[in-house]
């Protein structure tokens, strides 16, 4: 596992965007051989999406031959609801880059058969081989996507019940009213995520400090699904200073020295 310790959340966004752009450019994608990118929603990746849009506008990266898969979607709200993850992705990213509509893959939270929809999504991912790079965030309780505490670390895409903590955290997007926050979501599984060639998780803010500690210094534990990153051969966590407050000083020092040349300029 790599840990990229930066000072601010803005730096996390810029580092992550530069990393994604480099991966895409090094891959040299074509229509027949697209780069497959996994994407999250929420507050944490907004800085990354903003930085990626800037890189696109500067001509430093193209998404024409990039295929995307999103992590999750709420069940029971319309696709055009302002807080659906479809709306989030188009408003904050897709509408501002050159991605082709047919290359955008999103879970349908209003599908009549949720199990069939989840299997369709898994099959679609497999049709591309695997996801080249999956970017994600992490919840205060260490959940990745909507794989809440005690989720199976070999789980696949499925419907999940959201914990009250998650609904409270997400109520900030619903006028602070938890009753407006859906109780269920479709989400990729931890196993789905681990199938990716590379995983990059963004961690910002002091409220994520315990989750970061569990991911880096804790044992692999289904109560902290982010800890499953320890099982992956190519995972990277990009974090800001406030999120590292629960880590041992020597841990932060170790990774700061190890990644020194990769942090320069950010």
Swiss-Prot record:
| Positions of the record's site feature: Part of the allosteric site | 151, 158, 160-161, 254
Superkingdom is Bacteria
Task: List, alphabetically, the Gene3D superfamilies matched.
Answer: 3.40.50.1360
Q: Which reactions is this enzyme annotated as catalysing?
A: alpha-D-glucosamine 6-phosphate + H2O = beta-D-fructose 6-phosphate + NH4(+)
Q: Tell me which NCBIfam families the record gives.
A: nagB, PRK00443.1-5
Hey, which family's this protein in?
Belongs to the glucosamine/galactosamine-6-phosphate isomerase family. NagB subfamily.
- Function, as annotated: Catalyzes the reversible isomerization-deamination of glucosamine 6-phosphate (GlcN6P) to form fructose 6-phosphate (Fru6P) and ammonium ion.
Name recorded for this polypeptide: Glucosamine-6-phosphate deaminase
- The protein's organism comes out as Vibrio vulnificus (strain YJ016)
